[in-house]
Amino acid sequence: MSLRCGGAVRTVGPRVFGRYVFSPVREVSFLPDEKKEFLQSGPDLQEFISGNLADKSTWDEYKGNLKRQKGERLRLPPWLKTEIPMGKNYNKLKNTLRNLNLHTVCEEARCPNIGECWGGGEYATATATIMLMGDTCTRGCRFCSVKTARNPPPLDANEPYNTAKAIAEWGLDYVVLTSVDRDDMPDGGAEHFAKTVSYLKERNPKILVECLTPDFRGDLKAIEKVALSGLDVYAHNVETVPELQRKVRDPRANFDQSLRVLKHAKEVRPDVISKTSIMLGLGENDEQVYATMKALREADVDCLTLGQYMQPTKRHLKVEEYITPEKFKYWEKVGNELGFHYTASGPLVRSSYKAGEFFLKNLVAKRKTKAL
């Protein structure tokens, strides 16, 4: 699985789910007008990456350990504690989801960027990430808390149509379609992905569609089916450096197979934008991160996101290290030097983020113009 409140103030600490952190905050209506306006309009990508929503003055004073010692459980550093800006469209989108029985990674994972992505804005791209093919995965990666089963429930045949209907109602500019792994199906769910993209493009040819797919067990025909479905961005996450694949991911997944997925998508659709993501803080070293980034760029991957791994439950892999915002900024610089068209690197950066989609929207438009 490759995945992405309100009311009174609560005193509990942040919740974590997969690679996301959620800190309950005050309802926007209780805030001063100036602060309310700032939260509703939302910061841009660089502001969020650098953590301007948190009190940066406390960062240098932080004395907690950033690397885990044996038997220790690391405390959350201040740069991972941040408010969640809620846009005006939040409740509308949430109600639409309920009525159509759709799941989003944004909600399931309690992503801290949900208010910004769903809210859109004058200079933003209203974005949502829909999780297809149910909520039960056939794999058991050690970083992910999505429930697993050997034989999940059958697919909802109406899901592709309902997804297209939801996007039409929302008026989104950019949608990310992702899914659980479905090794129980002959094509891994590739046809389901392709149908959903087709319905979306029929209803709104201008909508930009990103598919964040499983590895389809390395089935090239399945990869082709999705790549040729009319999508604009093909994403598949390698998750971590090659040396930690067996420790972090299900045994059926591996770095070389994931790299082949990304390569093959570009081979059958040279104009498609390819994208992947790496979690940091699992015990990797700098040399391994650099070598991984280099291998991805050599495979012609266009866009890369790097974010902090967050332990979802005590049963999952512990965080080995909290990476500082400065180190994330360093990796962003390295990504740019290696030639990625877009590198988003920061503690709270995830595979899908509104300012990232805004950039990708412009990149897609440029490539389409060049192809004409």
Curated annotation (Swiss-Prot):
User: Per its UniProt record, what Pfam families does this chain match?
Assistant: LIAS_N (PF16881), Radical_SAM (PF04055)
Note whether Iron-sulfur occurs among the keywords: yes
Q: Which residues does the record give as [4Fe-4S] cluster 2 binding sites?
A: 137, 141, 144
Targeting signal (transit peptide) range: 1-27
The segment(s) forming the Radical SAM core domain are 122-341
Q: Name one GO biological process term.
A: lipoate biosynthetic process
Pathway, per UniProt? Protein modification; protein lipoylation via endogenous pathway; protein N(6)-(lipoyl)lysine from octanoyl-[acyl-carrier-protein]: step 2/2
| InterPro entries associated with the record | Aldolase_TIM, Elp3/MiaA/NifB-like_rSAM, LIAS_N, Lipoyl_synth, rSAM
Compartmental location: Mitochondrion
How is its cofactor bound, per UniProt? Binds 2 [4Fe-4S] clusters per subunit. One cluster is coordinated with 3 cysteines and an exchangeable S-adenosyl-L-methionine.
Instruction: List the molecular function annotations (GO) for this entry.
Output: 4 iron, 4 sulfur cluster binding; lipoate synthase activity; metal ion binding
One GO CC term on file: mitochondrion
Keyword check for Iron-sulfur:
yes
What domain of life is recorded for the organism?
Answer: Eukaryota
Q: Can you state which reaction this protein catalyses? A: [[Fe-S] cluster scaffold protein carrying a second [4Fe-4S](2+) cluster] + N(6)-octanoyl-L-lysyl-[protein] + 2 oxidized [2Fe-2S]-[ferredoxin] + 2 S-adenosyl-L-methionine + 4 H(+) = [[Fe-S] cluster scaffold protein] + N(6)-[(R)-dihydrolipoyl]-L-lysyl-[protein] + 4 Fe(3+) + 2 hydrogen sulfide + 2 5'-deoxyadenosine + 2 L-methionine + 2 reduced [2Fe-2S]-[ferredoxin]
Cofactors demanded by this protein: [4Fe-4S] cluster
Q: Which UniProt keywords apply?
A: 4Fe-4S, Iron, Iron-sulfur, Metal-binding, Mitochondrion, S-adenosyl-L-methionine, Transferase, Transit peptide
NCBIfam families assigned: lipA, PRK05481.1, PRK12928.1
Which PANTHER family does the record match to this protein? LIPOYL SYNTHASE (PTHR10949), LIPOYL SYNTHASE, MITOCHONDRIAL (PTHR10949:SF0)
Question: What's the protein called, per UniProt?
Answer: Lipoyl synthase, mitochondrial
User: What species does this protein belong to?
Assistant: Bos taurus (Bovine)
